[in-house]
Amino acid sequence: MKNNKISGFQWAMTIFVFFVITMALSIMLRDFQSIIGVKHFIFEVTDLAPLIAAIICILVFKYKKVQLAGLKFSISLKVIERLLLALILPLIILIIGMYSFNTFADSFILLQSTGLSVPITHILIGHILMAFVVEFGFRSYLQNIVETKMNTFFASIVVGLMYSVFSANTTYGTEFAAYNFLYTFSFSMILGELIRATKGRTIYIATTFHASMTFGLIFLFSEEIGDLFSIKVIAISTAIVAVGYIGLSLIIRGIAYLTTRRNLEELEPNNYLDHVNDDEETNHTEAEKSSSNIKDAEKTGVATASTVGVAKNDTENTVADEPSIHEGTEKTEPQHHIGNQTESNHDEDHDITSESVESAESVKQAPQSDDLTNDSNEDEIEQSLKEPVTYKEDRRSSVVIDAEKHIEKTEEQSSDKNK
């Protein structure tokens, strides 16, 4: 796994802030239900809380790209496959529930026959909107954040617990609240498995499953009005389907892994072995980077010292060639001139060599772990590498010019003597 995720502190703070804002807003928005005049089984105003909390977290915290990784709206073959499952699984749950009602209660309740006073299209649109705003916050945003440090299964458990607390209903007693908690947790676990390995394309799948479940339950069961048997049947049916679907998915992936011998990362991108050594890998990467910087600086220092030695040898060889040029013309005055010039060359060479060595030593003694210091050291090293080469070229050209001038002067003197 690539370590391009958010830090552990921001990860924990994002989850905490999202949950606190969601719960606080759900309490504050309850009073607006009666103000807007919309019935709660059409659109629940408190469901806006996860959407608002997600937007606030995106604006407040950094690493926007990581936070928005679960909010992709593109379509793939896997998304189409999961969309079909998002329609089939609610149908299976409703069939199990209706069969249970017919077996244990002799009938199931149709709310439409007991006084729904709004068109079905209004209910459908309202439930699609509710599903979108809730799943935008919990699945497309929160689950994506949690999965940066956990695998999909455990991330679904964490998000499922938070979603169950958010959806808790204590109005009709403790037993009703317990079965409602089981229902919402199983509901969330199914959704977590449905959006697994979709690479951020979660909103279509989550919205379809959520809207299908709530829309069907409104017409077939009376849990909305506090019927204990209804919520019990719904909770147990959803839990059975959740266990069966997740278990079957794990078995299929296990068989595929054993038979094809594919890499576990290829088979399941966010698997159980991910995120185990995230902190260790990060520390190891930083240590390797620091040691490589130290080695590079040491090698550069050695290269600078060797370059200084080469420059010194080139200068000595250039100076040593000067007597042979001057001996061809005159033996007295040129030798005296060459001697003085050699002494000055050695003095200048000594100065340049000492300066280059000092620059190499300063590079070795500079802090190796700081990236900004390494950049400045590299500039100094490049400058020190350029100075000996430039000096060598300047000295060669100056020696040639002096030799040409001396030859011309000697020729003039010899011509004067001949005259």
UniProtKB/Swiss-Prot annotation:
Query: What GO cellular component is one of the record's annotations?
Result: plasma membrane
> Locations of Basic and acidic residues compositional bias?
282-299, 323-336, 344-353, 383-419
Topology of this chain in the membrane: Multi-pass membrane protein
Chief localization: membrane
Q: Which residues form a coiled coil?
A: none
Region (Disordered), start-end ranges: 273-419
Recite the UniProt keywords alphabetically: Cell membrane, Cell wall, Membrane, Secreted, Transmembrane, Transmembrane helix
| Subcellular compartments | Cell membrane; Secreted, Cell wall; Cell septum
Q: Which domain of life is it from?
A: Bacteria
Task: Please give the Pfam families that the UniProt record associates with this protein.
Answer: Rce1-like (PF02517)
Q: Where is the composition biased (Acidic residues)?
A: 372-382
MF term (GO), any: endopeptidase activity
One Gene Ontology BP term is: CAAX-box protein maturation
Instruction: Describe its partners and assembly state.
Output: Interacts with N-acetylglucosaminidase SagB; interaction is direct and facilitates peptidoglycan processing. Interacts (via N-terminal region including transmembrane domains) with sensor protein kinase WalK (via N-terminal region including transmembrane domains). Interacts (via N-terminal region including transmembrane domains) with sensor protein kinase SaeS. Interacts with other histidine kinases, perhaps via their transmembrane domains.
- Family, as annotated: Belongs to the LyrA family.
Q: What does this protein do?
A: Involved in bacterial cell envelope homeostasis. Regulates peptidoglycan processing by N-acetylglucosaminidase SagB, perhaps acting as a scaffold protein. Pleiotropic regulator of gene expression, probably acting via interactions with multiple two-component systems. Plays a role in the abundant deposition of the immunoglobulin G-binding protein A (spa) at the cross-wall, a subcellular structure that initially arises from cytokinesis.
Please provide the record's free-text comment about the domains of this protein: C-terminal region not involved in glucosaminidase activity of the SagB-SpdC/LyrA complex.
Q: What is this protein called?
A: Lysostaphin resistance protein A
| Annotated organism of origin | Staphylococcus aureus (strain COL)
What's the encoding gene here?
lyrA
